[in-house]
Amino acid sequence: MKLQKNISLKPYHSFACEEIASLFTSVDTKDALIEAIDWANNNNQPYLILGSGTNILFTKQFNGLVIKMEITGIQKLQETSSEILLQVGAGENWTHFVSYCVQKSWGGLENLSLIPGSVGAAPIKNISAYGVEVGEHIVSVDAFDTIKKQWVTITQQDCAFGYRTSIFKKEVNRYIVCAVQFKLSKQPLLRTDFGAIKSVLHDRGIINPSVESIASAVINIRSNQWPDSKKIANAGSFFNNPSITTTQFDHLILQFPSLKAYPIDDHTYKIDAGWLIEASGWKGVTKNHVGFYQDQAMVIVNYSATKGQTILNFSEEIMQSVLIKFGVNLESAISIV
C-alpha cells in the first residue's frame, strides 16, 4: 500500500477547498481496499472512502486515512435480445458510464446523463433526474460490510431505495460500495415528458426520440442550468427539497400563495428548496467569496474561499433564515466532513 502524508484535498473534491488529509492512499482492487481498511484499523486511524468528491465538503483537516476509490471497469455479465446486465466498478466515472451505454443504445440511464460523480455514489444517493431514479435499473450492489467484515451482495429490494436515499445512506459508513450491477433495455420505455426534455426535442424537430436524442437533450439542459465544477467550484444541489405534512402545507399556502410544492402522497408535500431560499432573500447574495450560481438558488458556489468552513457557515445562515420565515428545516444534500 502506497501511503502519502499531509496531502491537499483540493484536487480531490469539487468545492476545491484547501483542506488536508493527514494520510492518503488510493485503491483499484478489492484486495487493496481491504488492505487499506485493515491498516487503518490496526493503527487506530479513522478512514474515509472518497469517490469523485462531487458530493462532499471538507471543512477541516481530516486526521486519518482518506481512501480514494479507483476500482473501475465495465463488464458484460449477461445479454439477451431485449436486455443486458452489466457490472460496473464503483470508481468508474458516472458520465463516462452513461455515455458508454448511450453509444450502445442501451436504455434506462439516458435521463441521468451528465450527473457528476462516480458509479459507486449512484446507489447511495439513489440519484434521480427528469423522472428517472437509478434504483429502477440496479439489480444488485457488491459492497464490503464493515460490521460483519465480509463481502455482501445486496439486491435491489434490500437496497431500500427511496427519494435520494437508500440503505447505504441510512446505515451510514456500514457498507463500502465496490461494484454495481445494472439491467438495461435494448427496447427501452423512453421518458420524455419530464422537465424540459419534451421542449428540447420539439425545438429540434425530433418526433420519434431515441436513447441518444434524449441523452443529448438532457446534456443540453443540464449544461445550461448547472455549473461545470471544473470551471466553478461547486457540488451541485446543496440542499434537498424538504418534506412537510399536508397540515403544514395548508398553513403555508395561505400565507405564501406562490409557494412551490407538490404532493407525494395523501399526507406529505415536497417544497421547492430553491423557492424557499429565494423567498428568504438570498437570491444573488455573495458573502466571503461564496454565493449562488446565476439564478440557481440550490447551487452554492465557491468563488475563491479557501476554507470549507466558510461555505458551511454560508449554508447554515441560509438554513436558519428559512427556518425563521417558514418554519421548515432545510437539509444538506451533500456530506459534510
Stretch-by-stretch model annotation:
Residues 1-148:
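Anion-binding (especially nucleotide phosphate/pyrophosphate-binding) glycine-rich loop
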Residues 36-40, 193-197, 314-318:
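Short amphipathic alpha-helices in soluble, non-transmembrane regions
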